[in-house]
Design a protein with these regions (language model features):
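A detector for small-residue-rich transmembrane helices and their helix-helix packing motifs
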Residues: 1-211
Length: 211
């Protein structure tokens, strides 16, 4: 699948800004966050992306929300292994620069959405879901090991993630959080939106010709 041309042009100009082993760095942040929260659970509140707290000088929150563990039990071991496969696939498919750009766009989108709608972000899950969506779009049949033994195709993981996020917002979230979610997905929209737009245009044209 071809990515938008502007991404390749950007890589030629500032490709040196890539972060090698970005996936490993993010997993390490999750490990550190897990250890900290495990020892002092109250610290988790200091890691949230809270717009009002950031404006009061707690700048670290712009980065530390990425380290908030998705769970506080042994399941994190399986999750870290799972994330390793996720980032490895994207790094092989895209290279370090595109993966770095995808991360930065999602990170900035999450921060902007949080500030615009004044919604605290207490999890890495919003950003993580966009990686599921990316792999499911690039190769929906790609399989990863879940719990070290169970092979699951990425299209089902992405679908499950999308359903969970939708249900959370539909039944428990406010409209501000829903819009914040869209901002968090800006990386996916910018990377794959043009492809879907071209596909829809060609499909509409084909159907008109067949009428």
């Amino acid at each position: 699948m071809l990515l938008p041309e502007w991404i390749s042009k950007l890589e030629k100009k500032i490709g040196w800004l890539q972060v090698p082993q970005l996936g490993f760095i993010l997993i390490c942040m999750q490990v550190i966050g897990f250890i900290i929260v495990l020892k002092k659970p109250v610290v988790a509140e200091l890691l949230f992306l809270d717009p009002s707290a950031v404006l009061k000088g707690e700048i670290w929150r712009l980065f530390t929300f990425i380290a908030i563990p998705l769970t506080n039990d042994f399941l994190m071991l399986f999750l870290w292994w799972f994330l390793y496969y996720i980032f490895k696939f994207l790094r092989v498919s895209w290279g370090d620069f595109k993966l770095t750009l995808y991360f930065i766009l999602g990170w900035l989108g999450t921060i902007i959405g949080s500030f615009v709608f004044n919604v605290p972000v207490d999890s890495f899950m919003l950003m993580l879901s966009t990686y599921f969506f990316a792999i499911a779009t690039l190769n929906p049949e790609y399989e990863v090991l879940f719990f070290f033994i169970l092979r699951i195709k990425m299209k089902w993981i992405a679908l499950f993630s999308a359903i969970v996020l939708f249900l959370q917002q539909a039944f428990f979230g406010a409209w501000q959080m829903t819009l914040c979610l869209l901002f968090a997905c800006v990386n996916y929209i910018l990377f794959f939106g043009p492809h879907f737009y071209r596909f829809l245009r060609s499909e509409m044209k084909r159907r008109r010709e067949n009428i």
